[in-house]
């Protein structure tokens, strides 16, 4: 088969935050992260041999920006003892506690900072970026060609992995691979994220040991949801699909079983042409829905935290921001710092 690893830049982003919170440079702080993608935890933080892990909460609580923009992550740090790699709003989408009621979302999520937990946030910024790109691309083609210089090299893993495979120069990063015992208390067949080393021989993953019990519990919920969803999709088993929905933290936070069953019926019918494996289940769902909706729904509801999609004319008011959004593949790289 094809040798494959998964790559993410969440570890690097949180690493920068941690260093800033302590008033240090990123290269002065050593970290070990372990978990699953988007639920990876900084289980060890060291500076000059000193373990700073237990001092991180105070550092974040006292930081003028992070204390406002990272409230979910800080609260998880407070209650679970470890900081998560995932951005504040996105982390709120993996656990059941911070999006239970629309009126409470603003207490945890700063919607003025990037797409930090807004409903359909990625869709909004990508729609705006696409529309702006189509408008502005002819002007971009008139600009000088981009120069690739070593000092401008970013933190994405890809080029460093290629360099290590070709030259043997060792590179340390955090990679997504099949567990195979790297993290003791997560399933062997789960895809985990943990430290690894790359050289001419490929990627080597040292053993991490046990993940702290609380973070492991959070990871295992998502692993269970993913396992149910995969088996449902492969086998066209709508019962497993419904169980996956029930186990999903956000769904379970706001929906009862009857609401979940009807929601799955509606979603299966709406996406019928892409889901041939569910043909029998979709026919049954159509019959149930034809009898009349059993649960009242909010017609036209757009979600609890949706923001306006800007037109090209509106984006013209800030061309620099629009160009950055359209040209940057990492939509979280340039987060606006707005005063609270």
Residue ranges of model-derived segments:
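Long, compositionally biased stretches enriched for glycine and/or charged residues
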Residues: 15, 19, 23-336
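Rossmann-like NAD(P)(H) cofactor-binding subdomain of soluble oxidoreductases
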Residues: 1-16
């Amino acid at each position: 088969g094809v040798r494959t690893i998964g790559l993410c830049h969440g570890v690097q982003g949180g690493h920068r935050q941690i260093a800033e919170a302590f008033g240090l440079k990123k290269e002065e702080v050593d970290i070990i992260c372990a978990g699953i993608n988007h639920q990876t935890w900084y289980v060890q933080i060291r500076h000059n041999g000193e373990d700073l892990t237990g001092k991180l909460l105070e550092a974040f609580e006292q930081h003028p920006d992070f204390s406002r923009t990272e409230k979910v992550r800080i609260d998880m740090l407070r209650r679970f003892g470890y900081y998560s790699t995932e951005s504040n709003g996105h982390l709120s989408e993996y656990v059941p506690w911070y999006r239970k009621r629309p009126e409470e979302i603003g207490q945890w999520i700063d919607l003025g900072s990037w797409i930090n937990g807004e409903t359909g946030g990625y869709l909004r910024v990508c729609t705006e970026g696409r529309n702006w790109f189509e408008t502005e691309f002819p002007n971009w083609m008139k600009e000088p060609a981009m120069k690739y210089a070593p000092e401008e090299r970013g933190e994405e893993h890809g080029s460093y992995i290629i360099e290590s495979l070709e030259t043997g120069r060792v590179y340390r990063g955090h990679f997504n691979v099949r567990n195979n015992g790297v993290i003791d208390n997560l399933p062997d067949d789960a895809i985990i994220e943990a430290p690894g080393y790359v050289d001419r021989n490929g990627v080597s993953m040292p053993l991490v040991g046990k993940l702290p019990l609380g973070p492991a519990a959070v990871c295992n919920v998502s692993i269970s949801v993913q396992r149910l969803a995969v088996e449902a999709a492969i086998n066209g088993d709508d019962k497993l699909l419904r169980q996956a929905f029930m186990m999903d933290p956000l769904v379970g936070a706001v929906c009862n079983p009857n609401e979940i069953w009807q929601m799955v019926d509606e979603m299966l019918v709406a996406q019928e042409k892409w889901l041939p494996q569910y043909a029998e289940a979709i026919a049954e769902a159509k019959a149930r829905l034809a009898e009349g909706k059993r649960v009242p729904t909010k017609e036209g509801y757009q979600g609890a935290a949706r923001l306006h999609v800007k037109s090209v004319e509106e984006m013209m008011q800030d061309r620099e921001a629009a160009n950055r959004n359209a040209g940057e593949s990492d939509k979280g790289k340039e987060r606006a710092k707005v005063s609270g």
